[in-house]
């Protein structure tokens, strides 16, 4: 709680103080959700690619984290990019459909899921990898 006050941040009644403090500490440490998930995926899959392009011929889509051999697209969702505006939401759905038609499995995770349950997120990714490899 002291970190929150020292940084001049405000906590609403809807934000539990422990959660707000944890988020503040992570941000101060430079631990953004994409960095945390990238480190976890890369540790298990050295062939993983970040900001992957070329998944859909003729489209300039960029995948946050891609396992190209398995055709698994891992996306980190945040309201600042996905859903703040209706047009962005529609574009995101169109993009996901194009990826699916091209044979990609799209897994979407929020920052909250990554920070609160990285082990569960990693387990979901591993299950998808095993399914894609036919195991």
Model regions and ranges:
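Solvent-exposed, charged helical/coil patches
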Residues: 1-49, 133-135
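Conserved short-loop catalytic and cofactor-binding motifs
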Residues: 25, 53, 83, 87
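Amphipathic coiled-coil/heptad-repeat helices and related helical stalk/stem segments
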Residues: 34, 58-59, 92
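Active-site metal-binding core of divalent-cation-utilizing nuclease and nuclease-like domains
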Residues: 42-73
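Basic, amphipathic alpha-helical patches used to engage nucleic acids or provide basic targeting signals
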Residues: 62-128
């Amino acid at each position: 709680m002291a970190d929150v006050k020292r940084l001049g941040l405000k906590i609403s009644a809807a934000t539990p103080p422990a959660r707000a403090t944890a988020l503040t500490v992570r941000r101060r440490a430079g631990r953004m959700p994409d960095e945390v998930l990238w480190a976890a995926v890369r540790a298990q899959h050295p062939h993983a690619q970040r900001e992957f392009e070329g998944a859909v011929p003729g489209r300039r889509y960029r995948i946050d984290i891609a396992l190209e051999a398995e055709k698994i697209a891992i996306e980190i969702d945040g309201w600042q990019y996905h859903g703040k505006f209706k047009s962005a939401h529609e574009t995101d759905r169109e993009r996901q459909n194009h990826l699916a038609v091209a044979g990609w499995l799209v897994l979407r995770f929020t920052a909250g899921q990554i920070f609160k349950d990285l082990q569960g997120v990693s387990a979901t990714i591993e299950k998808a990898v095993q399914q894609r490899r036919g195991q």
